[in-house]
Structure formats: C-alpha cells, structure tokens
Amino acid sequence: MKYMTADEIRQSFLKYFESKGHTIVKSASIIPENDPTLLFVNAGMVPFKNVFLGLEERPYKRAASCQKVFRVSGKHNDLENVGYTPRHHTFFEMLGNFSFGDYFKKEAIEFAWEYLTEHLEIPKEKLLVSVFEEDDEAFEIWNKHIGLDESKIKRMGYKDNFWSMGDTGPCGPSSEIYYDRGEKFGNPEFGAEDDFRYLEIWNLVFMQYNRDEKGVLHPLPNPSIDTGMGLERIASVLQGVDSNYDTDLFKPIIQFAEEVSGKEYGKNEKDDIAMRVIADHLRAITFLISDGVLPANEGRGYVLRRIIRRALRYGKNLGIEKPFLYEGVDVVIEKMKTAYPELIQNRSFIKTITKSEEEKFIKTLKRSMDILYQMIEQARKENRRHLTGEETFKLYDTYGFPIDLMEEILKDEGFTFDLIEFHNLLEEQKERARKSWKSQSKEIKPVYLTLKNKLPENQFVGYETLTSENSKVLAIIKGDQLVDTAKEGEDIEIVLDITPFYPEKGGQIGDRGIIEGDEFLFEVLDTQTPVDGLIVHKGKVLFGSVKEGAYVRAKTDKERRENIMRHHTATHLLHAALRNVLGDHVKQAGSLVSDEYLRFDFTHFESMTDEELKAVEELVNREIMKNEEVVCQEMQYEEALKSGAMAIFEEKYADVVRVISAGISKELCGGTHVKRTGDIGYFKILSESAVSSGTRRIEAVAGIKAVEKGLQEHYIIKDLSRLLTAKEDQLLDRVLKLQNQIKEKEREIENLRKKLALSNINENLNIIEKEGFKVAYVSVENLNPNELREIADHLRQKLGKSVILVASKDAEKQKVNFVVAVSKELSENYKAGDIVKKVASAANGSGGGRPDFAQGGINDTSKLSQLFEEFKKIFS
C-alpha cells in the first residue's frame, strides 16, 4: 500500500478521473448557491443538485471534484462527536466522481476498484463492500465482474444502502466500500453496529429512480452516479494511522495547540479531546470565513459563532485564557493553500474576524460569569439550591455561556439546574431557527422548470447593445400557466430567444423597457432569472395582443440602464477605496445597484469617522476624474485570482469569468458597467450605518443623482446663510453660537418655572401632621419628572422628617407624572417604591424605585384626586 500525503491523494484522485474523461470541477463555496433550504454544502453532490434534478445543464456528462463540506445540523450533525471519535468532523473534503446520464453501475464500480487497488495500491484482500439488499445487479458486478468473493459482499437494507435526495425526487441504491483495519480492532461481524474494524471509505450511489408523492419509485430515463470518499478517511488508511487526527491534515494544527497550551498530545485523554476539537474547529473557522460567513446571532453566522466559542471553551480547558485561534489560522492556511489558494488572499481578513470574535466572547464570558453568580446569590436568598432551565438557557443562548462550564461552577457552589427544561428550551429554539430558515426558501414555479427543460438557453446581448431588433417570443406565462396569446391590460411574463434586458442578479436590479411587435406593445417592468439559463420579462400588455412565435423588437430603457451602470462601476470603485482607506479586512458583504442609488455592505468593526468618509469619497471622485477606460476581460477563474481580481464571497463563478478593471478596482463581475470611469460623472456618499456586528453599510449616489443631491445641499446652505445672516464659511460658528444661546435661555426658563412652581406650592401644599413626622402632597402644572424630584427634595429639606408626594399634569400627553420622597429615618417603615406601586396601581398606573425615592405615572389626568386619596389612606 502506497504512503501518500493528503495533497498527493487529492491530486491523484482528480488526475485519475480526468484520464477517464471526467471534467474536473473546482470546489464550490461552502455556502450553497441559490438553495435556501440548506445552511451549508453538506455533501459532494450539492453543487450538482440542479443537474441531477434536470434544472441545469452542464457542458459535460462526467465530473470529478474535491468539495469543501461542512456538517453541523440536520441529519448530518457531527458537532457533539467532534474530538471524541477518530472520524467525526465539522469541516472535511469529499472526493467524488459523478455521471449525469452517462455511465452507470458497472463503470462506477470499475473506476472505484481500479483506483483503490491499482493507483492507491490498497491490497484487494483488505476491501469489502455492501450493496442494497434488492440490488442483484450491483451484487453480480462485484461478484462476477470484479471477482470479489460472496463472503465479502454484504446485503443491507434501506437504512444503510438506499439514498434519497428528499421525501420525493431522485433516489437509488448504494454500494459502500470498506477497508479492513485488522484483528487488533476486534473481530465483529462485517456491518455490525459500533464496528471499529471495518472502515467505510467510499460510497457509490446509483440514482436510478424518481420517488413520487405517494412513495412509488419510477425508473429514471437517464440514471446517474454520485460517489463520495472522505479525504481525511482515505488519508488515515494510506498513512497507516488509526485516527484522522493523526494524518498530515491535522498534525500541524495539533502541534500548534500543544505550543499555545504547553500541553503534550497523547498524554491525557481530556487534553487530547480538547486539542482535536481545536484542530477541527480551526479548519472550519478558516474556511467558513474565507467563503463569506461572518459571526452573527442567526443562520450561518450563528453556527460560526458557536464553533469559535466551542473552540475557545476547549482552549480554556487547556488553560488558554487569551485569544489564540486567530494565530492558528496561519497554520491551517499553510497546510491547505495549495488546494485552496484563495485562503492566502483572505488571510488577513480571516484572522481579523476571528480575533475580534474571540475578544468579544472573552468579554461576554466575564460578564455572564457575573450574571451566573448573581443568579446563584438570588437563589440562595429564596432558599433554592437549583437554577431553573430558563435561567441557565438564557445564559447559554444570550451570552454563549458554555453549558459544561456552567455545570462545573454550579456543582462547586452546591447547586443543580433543570436539565430537562434546558433541553426543551434548546429544542424549541432550534425548531424556531429551522422554521425561520425554511421560510426563506423560495419555491420555483413548475412552469419555469417546464420551460427550462423545453427551451434553449436565452442569449443575452445586453453587454453589447440595448436593443434587439429581431427577437422571437418563445413563451408567454400568465399566472402559473403557459398561454399562446395575451391581450391588452394583462400582466404576463415573456421569454425571448435573444434579449438585451439584464436580469436581476449579483446585486444589480433587472432592466425595464419595452417589447414591441406589429400588433402589440408590452412594457417590461422587471427582468428576472428564476432558474439558470431562463430570463423572463415581467410586465403589462399596453395595447394589442402578443402571440407565441411572434418576432419583436426588444428595447431596454437607455437612461435607466445608464444610471444603473454608473452606480455599478461606482460600487466597484467604492469597494476599492474602502480597502485603501480602512484596510484589506474590508470585504463586500452584500450590495444593491439600482438606477436611483447604490447600497454597499462591507465588513468593518466600527463606524467610519467623518475623515474616513471624506477620504473614500474623494478617492472615488479622483478615479472618476481620471476618466480611465473600464476594461472587461474573460479569463479562467484561477488566472483571474492570480491577476489580483477580487472575488465576492457568496457569488458562484464559472470556470471562465468576466474581470472588470476600473481604475484602482479589479473585480470578478457579471454585471453591466460604463465604458470609462468618467462616465460616472460624480459620486456622493449619503450615509454610513451599522447592519449588524462587524458589518457596515454605505448608501451613495452617482451621476445625475449625485449632482441633484449636491445641488440640493448647495441651496439648503444658501438658504441657511440668508436666514442666519452669515457667510457660508461662518455658518458652523453661527449655529454653535445660536445653540449656546438657546441652551442659556432654556436654563433661564427652567429656573423661572421652578420659582413659579415653588411659589404656588406654598399656597397649594397639603400637610397632614402625624406623630413625629409630616405627610404632604401637592399638584403642580407641566413639570417633568426631574423637576418634580427637585421640588420633592426641596420640600423634604423644608419639612424635615416627612413623606411627600408631588404630582404634575401633562396636559398635552394626558398623563400625570408623580414622585414620592421619604426621609431616610422613615424609609424602613414607609418605602417610597412600595408607596408609588400602591397608589399607581389604584389609578391603573405604574411605577417604582428606591426606599427613599420613587416615581410613577398614570395615563388619565382625571384620576389625580384618586391618586391623592390612595396616598392619604396609607397614613390613616
């Protein structure tokens, strides 16, 4: 058996299948493209899902890939096992070969056997296989054609050897190949539960059926093949180690964990588990952030946040108290950079995001520790020796407090907590998250799928021209149905063979315009691409009737498109300027490009200063003034990245990509752009704000929209200059001076109101003499709670030992504000907070506070007398 490094195995696998006529497809992003039903790519076949479903055509029938895969949820939830077993991972690489209606079982089995035994030189006697119990064909191929003895072929049921994409759709039997690790792992029966001897290394899925809504299986006209072999597993076999964590993929990261912790791997099982968790999670963190996932409180970002916090928790178990994961990112990149060169480009960004999240969690953990001890103290006061599930879940969910650390602290304090209630709340939260995620899923109308399979791909000519003189109407959609004709006033969708209309994608909105024929005029209100390769024009028939098969003139709204192009190229310049001013950690996190304005979301950890915004705006405008040519080139994806072109995180790119070079910007982009930077005209930032933690948003305008905004601000300044009788360069000083004058006048007015209120109090104050103290109450007009407090303090000093209520009607809001002040000597028996609650509740109000001072309010001015009566009752 040949020893091979992981890089050598990856290269060998792809080279072998390339020699067998397979197109090598680079790994897709971990973030699934156009599939909101999945949080992450969790299998090697996911990027080919639409091909298997017949929704997408590729220029090849055979493919092979090494796909980045991430599993933490659904049926593929490996998180809790990570670090505790030799094989479970969150992130791993899946080697796979695929056939889309080309070869089938015989060839798939032949390829797998030949590659394993001849190219990897695994001894044949070490290999066993399983087949679906009813799949006689696969059994015969293994037995008769390959020559595998019957004793090494195990028939298994639906659970183990029948694969399906979902409740309905493509499915079929599978055949799994196992490696016998030898008698030192026991002598269990092949296929038994908890079998550590026989290691599954390759799964061959034979997609030959379509399951309908009733569960009935129908043979597919073009059966397909989907196979998957985990790189980490096959590496453990070829490198002769018992655990994936002992392969060259993980050893450098575990060595890093040893160095940063001062512990030695292999000496203590608890420490070993922690190091394995850190090694796995560091790989996941690096690839997730590189592919565009950012820490957040929901969705993919929440998963990343959990992974980072889980790794930190295990680091704490090793005695690591400071941020350290960001340093380990370098180790992961060094190991994986050959296969994934984009990691090098994203290194600084990945480290910045990781370190920031580590620092936040360490601060949060300190705060949540304080809250936990407060909960323990409160429980002791209530004679409880346990915390509720609700209390502990809040710490876990809101603050990310590790549950095992919580258990340890509670145990040390002699406490327990309601674990059942905690898990119930956890499941409820997971279910809410699942429903929230699924609700984002957009169903593709069956009519679009029908057209996708029926029609040739639309030809888009909108890069070169805004008008197509001789397009043909291929289809008309009304509602969810295909129709032959549509008449005046009807809302429909039209599909053309050739179109200049750009469909909404990549943040750029869809084009508008008209489609006209000899007998009709159709207004295009939006252009969309519901499935790849199908462009639909949505709008209304203005007059006449349109028929399928008609030849038409399609004309895009020229002014609108030009404004969109200005904003799109301006967005590229803005992105480059932000990186120039703020640093390379800036990455696009979302965008909207319209004819009216642009919106650009980007990664940054604090609000931008006025100086930074000014520098960005000035840099963009300098690039516009240079009036350089905007160059569009088509090149191979890898070549584009090497040339320095920026790739946007969540975009999917073909092997051949468009690279847009505009001044300081060079990006991969499929959108429409101006010919020269000077065509943008002028650029102006409107606002900068927060979207979420670590993500900022800039809204801006370009071209005539920017000129309009500039003119609007110019005339506002002129009007202000006239109104304030100051020159434009003196406006700021004039406004500051006016503000100070207004504040001074407000202070004078406030003092006069207080004096007036105090003079009225002497006439209206009601005093009840009690034994050893006084009870007083009074009503004053239109004072706020702070002013009421000052009056109450004044009366308390004047009257000596006393309990005082001061109330004020707010006529405008139809509300009564009131305060109660109690001398400290009386606050043990007459607590201000209790008095406020009692009198407020009697008048349907609310309030509370300290024993010596409290405040409240009621939303009905007619109940003021009732408030006073309740107050007097307390002392009667």
From Swiss-Prot:
Q: Name one GO biological process term.
A: alanyl-tRNA aminoacylation
Q: Which GO terms describe its cellular component?
A: cytosol
Gene Ontology MF terms in the entry: alanine-tRNA ligase activity; aminoacyl-tRNA deacylase activity; ATP binding; tRNA binding; zinc ion binding
The cross-references to Pfam families, in alphabetical order and at most eight, read: DHHA1 (PF02272), tRNA-synt_2c (PF01411), tRNA_SAD (PF07973)
UniProt catalytic activity:
tRNA(Ala) + L-alanine + ATP = L-alanyl-tRNA(Ala) + AMP + diphosphate
User: Which InterPro entries does the UniProt record give?
Assistant: aa-tRNA-synth_II, aa-tRNA-synth_II/BPL/LPL, Ala-tRNA-lgiase_IIc, Ala-tRNA-ligase_IIc_anticod-bd, Ala-tRNA-synth_IIc_core, Ala-tRNA-synth_IIc_N, Ala-tRNA_ligase, Ala_tRNA_ligase_euk/bac
**Class of this enzyme:** ligase
Residues that coordinate or bind Zn(2+): H568, H572, C669, H673
Written domain comment of the UniProt record: Consists of three domains; the N-terminal catalytic domain, the editing domain and the C-terminal C-Ala domain. The editing domain removes incorrectly charged amino acids, while the C-Ala domain, along with tRNA(Ala), serves as a bridge to cooperatively bring together the editing and aminoacylation centers thus stimulating deacylation of misacylated tRNAs.
> NCBIfam families, from UniProt?
alaS
**Protein role:** Catalyzes the attachment of alanine to tRNA(Ala) in a two-step reaction: alanine is first activated by ATP to form Ala-AMP and then transferred to the acceptor end of tRNA(Ala). Also edits incorrectly charged Ser-tRNA(Ala) and Gly-tRNA(Ala) via its editing domain.
Q: Which family does it belong to?
A: Belongs to the class-II aminoacyl-tRNA synthetase family.
Name under which the protein is recorded: Alanine--tRNA ligase
Q: Which organism is it from?
A: Sulfurihydrogenibium sp. (strain YO3AOP1)
**What gene name is given for the protein in this entry?**
alaS
